[in-house]
Every structure is written in structure tokens, then in C-alpha cells.
């Protein structure tokens, strides 16, 4: 296509779109730019794959350091594996796109977003989301779009669209809203304990801006003469569908109302119906029967139609009767149990959070400032993280066997969400300088493990003695929409997540929301339904919080005896080199003497860590004496370092030497210095004079016995 260049004036900042400039062999390609941030988004599709029953969509977001005028480090001087932030942005693009493709589409779709240029104000993520919609439309892939996304910030009492990095950092809200013409399709947010109503207003505010961007895409389509591609769904074998329904529907209904069945028992019962009532019946049909011919040609046909029938019956039961497969009401939370301190104190904090069959074991570890995760290797201005949450989902948690791999996108995404939920309640760094890591091990899963990780993290932090501002709990909300009938489900379990239309995770304190994430399987939700889901989550969160506080209602007053003890002090930044010493000699000596770990910040903040408080105090005293200002008349216990004919040099503090003239060694006349002192001797001295060059003149004369006894040894 010919080059197309269009600028959209959007909330005080232009968004520039260029099509036909780059990647002519991609199905669709758009360069979307705001400020100095520019992202190339491409969409490509291929022919359908045989034998799959899912949408083969792949989304990748990539960052290049040339975008910020930098060269990668390392021997190869190339970008390595994508950082965690890039994986999270890939998910951010994927989640609003996926529900807008036909669920029966089986052609491979690949979306690649590459940041080509980046400034320090405009984040590339929401640009990439909006750009993906334009690229998909241009690629003529069937799509229920257009779709767009914006970020909403809160500065004071005012919402703003697409805030800068600094505005997000200084505000109380970081919310991304994506939507289609049918409504909201994705929400993700971190908030500083904002009330539900504020969050609802922010989403509504953001969706209005999304509608403007959708309108701009329609204008572009009109100018270019493009239309959104449509495709007809594959035909359904109605005879086979009726055959399955006639033989299985009643049996499925009976299983769905056996509320005492566990997850494994229910799954087994449903599988047994498919195997006996359907597959055995098909096997008994004549070889030339159309149904048998169909199933032999398409072995997955029975499974797909049976799954569709189960989904339909479960959803009808919820909509018509208001009863779920485990017998709960729509707004009822599964049974909860909480335990803390399950492991020996070598693990600094531990908690087991159980909700139904979902079980999360969270373990907290306290570290020193040097353990903070350095984030300075990518394009973003953030320096380091002092709170880390890692989420693990082993195969045994769902009774499966799989090879163990490094964390995938799902694990990284769930871990980041739970981390975001806790961040607003962490104590300030100057009050609690520890770096904290929580690992949530999902040991059993039946839905809502990410919110279980939030609850487990809170309990583990309190068990570890971390003085969090307030405890945080979380709940996952679901949705069933049949025509105009909408039912919102509280605390969804696995089957409801799998067969439902929404997974809306809400976390927060009794004051307000700290994090939320909404994913859809339908093409959009009205604001009324979004608001109702957020409001319905509140009593669930508070109920869960009550259960947690019944086990531990405040952080433990003491840390684990195996947690490091931290002391902080300030020194003049000009003295940092003195404390470190040539080649790190001085600081290494202090750490070896005291068994401590020392971190020094550029502003002169010194953090000392040791398992025993006395060792940390010893290191602090050494650094204090090393950096303190000496005054005339003060008495010290020093060590003789060398002798010259006219006197002896004494180190009174680490790195600080003075000289005792031979006449100041004793009351009597001294013929040779060696008569009074030798190298290595400890001597009590007084600062007699500090000359204009800062040199110390010391004396052993005129020191009262009480002063000598009170001197604290510095080496």
C-alpha cells in the first residue's frame, strides 16, 4: 500500500500513525508514535493448522536499546532474553486482543511490537496495544474490533489520560483500560488503596478516551477504504450434536448438581459420561452411519461438542437457578483456612492459605539493600526493586506430570499482579530498609491462585515481622452472560474460569483497592456490569480478610532470629572512599572483623547487616569512629604503626594517624623512642593539637586515669 500518515490530537498530545512505511511483507504494519516514543506493530497470519482446538495467537513485545541511544553490555553487545517488563507488556497486548478474534479461528496469528524509539515520558505499552488493533485490521484477519487502550492516572483529585512515567510515580493510580465498540475488554491497575467508586470512575473515564481512539480508527479505515475482515464460522454437525445431547445431557445435569463432588471426582464423572454414553454408543453404530463417519474423520468432534454441551448446561444452571456446581450461591466464598509459622525460623516467614481446593504456600525472606533487584539494564528509568514476589505453579498442583521449565508468561504475570497488590502497604524504606522476597508456591490449584498468592503473601509478611501498613486480601470474580442475562460470580473455581466469560481479580485492604486485573472471553462489557463486579468483590475481600486476621492480626513484633539485623547510619558522601579504602581494603577488613555485610549508597547512607545485632553494632562503631571528626583534648586508644627517631606514629581511628613527639611520650626524659613503645603496642593518647593542615599532634601526658579507663577500643 502507499504510505499513509495521520496525526490524531488526543488529550493534549498528538498520536501519529504511519502505515505502508515499514514491513511491506507483513500482513499489517503500523508505526505509532507519541512524543519521542515510537513502536512498530506488525500482524501476520498464515493458513490454518490441522488438529488444534484453540486460537493460535502469539504476541511478542521487544525492546531495543538503540531506542534510547544505548549499546547493550556483555561480550556480544546484543540484546538478550526479554526482561520481565517486556513479557508483561506482551501479555498486556495479548489480553484485549484475544477475545476479539473468533474463538473458532485456527489460522496462526503473530503480533510483534518493537519499540524503535523511546523518551522518558511516554510509555510504549498502550501505544503498542492500540497499534496492534490497526495492524490486525490492515492484515484482514477476522476481528471484532477496532480496539484501543489508554492509561489513566490520578493526580490529586483529577484523572488524567496517558500520564508520564513521573506522573504515574507521583500519583495514586496506574490503570490501563482497553475496549472495543461493545465495551471494556481489559483492565489492569495498581492503586494506593483507592475506594471502589474511584476505580469505577477511573475505568469509565478511560473508556470514554478509548472510544475516541476507536473512532479515529474508523476514520482511518474510511480514508483508506478498508473494512474489518469477517469470516463465517465452520458448520456444526447438528445430527452429531443432537446425538450427544440426547445421550449425555441428563447425566451431565445430575453430575452438576452433586455439590459434594470434589474437582477430581466431578472431572472423572464427566469424562466417564463421554466415554460410556457417547463413545461406546458411537462404536455400536454401523460403519456407514453418518455420525460414525464424521467422528472417524474428526476424532476431536465428539470432545468439542461434549465440552460445549457441558458448558451450556453449567451456565444455564447458574443463570436459571442461581446455583453453582459446588452448591454455592453466586456471591459465596469457598471455605477458607489460614496457617502461619509452619516452617522453622530459618525461613523468615511462612504462611499456608487455603480456599477450597486452592492452596498457596507463601515464604518470605528478608535481605539487605544489596539484594535489591537491579532494573537498570532496560529502557526504563526505574532503578531497583526492594520487594519481589515470585509465583510458582508446579504440575503436581493440578495432578499432572510435566517437565519442569523456567517460569512462563503465566507465572510471571501472576507473580507481578500479586507483587503489585502488596507494594502500596510496604513500610517506607527509611523505616524498614530490608529488601523482601516472597515466593508463592501453588501446591494445589482450583482457581484464583493469584489472589491466593496475595493473601498468602500478606500472611507470610506478617509472620516475618514486616510492619506492613495494612493487610491485603484478594478475590477473583467471574461472569456468565447468556443473552441479556448476566450473573456475576464471587470467588470462581477452575471450571467456572474455564467455562465462564470473565476473570476479574480484585485485591485491596479494608480501605481500598491496591490492584486489579480483568480479562474477558467476550467482546466487551458495559460499565454497569464492570461496576457491579467491583462492588460485589468488596464484601468477599473483607470476608477473606477477617479469616486471615483471625490467625494473625498484626505483624510479629520480632524478626526471625535468623533474619539479618540492619542498622543504618549517615556519613559525609566525601568519606565514602575512606570507608571503602584502596581496592576495598578497609570495608573488607570491617566485614571480616565483624561478620557483617555493608552497603553504602551514593548519598552516604550506610546499611549494615548481620545475623547478630552485636556484630552489626560493632561494624557501625568502626565506621562511626573512622568518619567522626576529631577534636583537640579527646582521648583515644590507638596502635603504634611506625617509629622514627623523633617520635611514634599512632593510628587513633581507622585511617587516621597522628604523631607523638618523643618529648610527649613520658613525664621523664626519653632517650630513645623504643624505650617507651614498640610497633603494634596499644597506647592511650590525647589529641594535643590539630594543625592547619589537619595533622594530629598527640601526647601521653596529662591524661587522667579515669579518662584512660573509659576509652573505648577501636581496634
Curated annotation (Swiss-Prot):
The keyword Metal-binding applies. SMART domains: KH, S1. Its main location: cytoplasm. Pfam families: KH_1, PNPase, RNase_PH, RNase_PH_C, S1. Keywords: Cytoplasm, Magnesium, Metal-binding, Nucleotidyltransferase, RNA-binding, Transferase. Residues 564-623 form the KH domain. Residues 633-701 form the S1 motif domain. PROSITE patterns: KH_TYPE_1, S1. HAMAP family: PNPase. This is Polyribonucleotide nucleotidyltransferase. It comes from Crocosphaera subtropica (strain ATCC 51142 / BH68) (Cyanothece sp. (strain ATCC 51142)). The gene is pnp.
Amino acid at each position: 500500500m502507499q504510505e499513509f500518515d495521520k496525526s490524531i490530537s488526543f488529550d493534549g498530545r498528538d498520536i501519529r500513525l504511519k502505515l505502508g512505511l515499514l514491513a511491506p511483507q507483513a500482513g499489517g504494519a503500523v508505526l505509532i508514535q507519541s512524543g519521542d516514543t515510537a513502536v512498530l506493530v506488525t500482524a501476520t497470519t498464515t493458513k490454518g493448522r490441522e488438529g488444534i482446538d484453540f486460537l493460535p495467537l502469539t504476541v511478542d513485545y521487544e525492546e531495543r536499546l538503540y531506542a534510547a541511544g544505548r549499546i547493550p553490555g556483555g561480550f556480544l553487545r546484543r540484546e538478550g532474553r526479554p526482561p520481565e517488563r517486556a513479557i508483561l507488556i506482551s501479555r498486556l497486548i495479548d489480553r484485549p486482543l484475544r477475545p476479539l478474534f473468533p474463538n473458532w479461528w485456527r489460522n496462526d496469528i503473530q503480533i510483534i511490537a518493537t519499540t524503535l524509539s523511546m523518551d522518558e515520558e511516554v510509555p510504549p505499552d498502550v501505544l503498542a496495544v492500540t497499534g496492534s488493533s490497526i495492524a490486525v485490521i490492515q492484515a484482514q484477519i477476522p476481528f471484532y474490533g477496532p480496539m484501543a487502550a489508554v492509561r489513566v492516572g490520578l493526580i490529586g483529585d483529577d484523572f488524567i489520560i496517558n500520564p508520564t512515567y513521573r506522573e504515574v510515580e507521583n500519583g495514586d493510580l496506574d490503570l490501563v483500560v482497553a475496549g472495543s465498540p461493545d465495551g471494556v475488554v481489559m483492565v489492569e491497575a495498581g492503586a494506593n488503596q483507592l475506594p471502589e467508586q474511584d476505580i469505577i470512575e477511573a475505568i469509565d473515564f478511560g473508556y470514554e478516551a478509548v472510544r475516541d481512539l476507536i473512532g479515529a480508527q474508523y476514520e482511518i479505515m474510511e480514508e483508506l477504504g478498508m473494512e474489518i475482515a469477517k469470516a463465517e464460522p465452520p458448520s456444526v454437525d447438528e445430527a452429531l450434536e443432537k446425538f450427544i445431547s440426547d445421550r449425555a445431557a441428563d447425566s451431565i445435569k445430575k453430575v452438576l448438581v452433586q455439590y459434594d463432588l470434589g474437582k477430581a471426582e466431578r472431572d472423572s464423572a464427566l469424562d466417564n459420561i463421554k466415554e460410556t454414553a457417547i463413545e461406546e454408543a458411537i462404536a455400536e453404530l454401523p460403519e456407514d452411519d453418518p455420525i460414525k463417519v464424521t467422528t472417524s474423520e474428526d476424532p476431536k468432534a465428539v470432545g468439542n461438542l461434549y465440552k460445549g454441551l457441558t458448558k451450556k448446561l453449567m451456565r444455564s444452571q447458574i443463570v436459571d437457578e442461581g446455583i453453582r456446581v459446588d452448591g454455592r450461591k453466586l456471591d459465596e466464598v469457598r471455605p477458607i483456612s489460614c496457617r502461619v509459622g509452619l516452617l522453622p525460623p530459618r525461613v523468615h516467614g511462612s504462611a499456608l492459605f487455603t480456599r477450597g481446593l486452592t492452596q498457596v504456600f507463601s515464604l518470605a525472606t528478608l535481605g539487605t539493600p544489596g539484594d535489591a533487584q537491579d532494573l537498570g539494564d532496560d529502557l526504563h528509568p526505574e532503578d531497583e526493586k526492594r520487594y519481589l514476589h515470585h509465583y510458582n505453579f508446579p504440575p503436581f498442583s493440578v495432578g499432572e506430570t510435566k517437565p519442569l521449565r523456567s517460569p512462563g508468561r503465566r507465572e510471571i504475570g501472576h507473580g507481578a499482579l500479586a507483587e503489585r497488590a502488596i507494594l502500596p502497604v510496604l513500610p517506607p524504606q527509611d523505616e524498614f530498609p530490608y529488601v523482601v522476597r516472597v515466593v508463592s508456591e501453588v501446591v494445589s490449584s482450583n482457581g484464583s491462585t493469584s489472589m491466593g498468592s496475595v493473601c498468602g503473601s500478606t500472611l507470610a509478611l506478617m509472620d516475618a515481622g514486616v510492619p506492613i501498613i495494612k493487610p491485603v486480601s484478594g478475590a477473583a470474580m467471574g461472569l456468565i452472560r447468556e443473552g441479556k442475562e448476566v450473573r456475576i460470580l464471587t470467588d470462581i473455581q477452575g471450571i467456572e474460569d474455564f467455562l465462564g466469560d470473565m476473570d476479574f481479580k480484585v485485591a485491596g485492604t479494608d480501605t481500598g483497592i491496591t490492584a486489579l486485573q480483568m480479562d474477558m472471553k467476550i467482546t466487551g462489557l458495559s460499565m454497569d456490569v464492570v461496576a457491579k463486579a467491583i462492588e460485589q468483590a468488596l464484601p468477599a475481600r473483607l470476608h477473606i480478610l477477617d479469616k486471615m486476621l483471625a490467625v494473625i492480626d498484626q505483624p510479629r513484633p520480632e524478626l526471625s532470629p535468623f533474619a539479618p539485623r540492619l542498622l543504618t547510619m549517615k556519613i559525609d558522601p566525601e568519606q565514602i572512599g575512606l570507608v571503602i579504602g584502596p581496592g576495598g581494603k578497609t570495608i573488607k577488613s570491617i566485614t571480616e572483623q565483624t561478620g557483617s555485610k555493608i552497603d553504602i549508597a551514593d548519598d552516604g547512607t550506610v546499611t549494615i547487616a548481620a545475623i547478630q545485632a552485636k556484630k552489626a553494632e560493632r561494624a557501625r562503631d568502626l565506621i562511626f569512629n573512622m568518619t567522626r571528626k576529631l577534636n583537640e583534648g579527646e582521648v583515644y586508644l590507638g596502635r603504634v604503626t611506625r617509629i622514627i627517631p623523633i617520635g611514634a606514629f599512632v593510628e587513633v581511628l581507622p585511617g587516621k594517624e597522628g604523631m607523638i613527639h618523643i618529648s610527649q611520650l613520658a613525664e621523664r626524659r626519653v632517650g630513645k623512642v623504643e624505650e617507651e613503645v614498640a610497633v603494634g603496642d596499644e597506647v592511650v593518647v590525647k589529641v594535643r593539637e590539630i594543625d592547619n593542615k589537619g595533622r594530629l599532634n598527640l601526647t601521653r601526658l596529662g591524661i587522667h586515669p579515669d579518662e584512660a579507663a573509659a576509652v573505648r577500643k577501636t581496634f
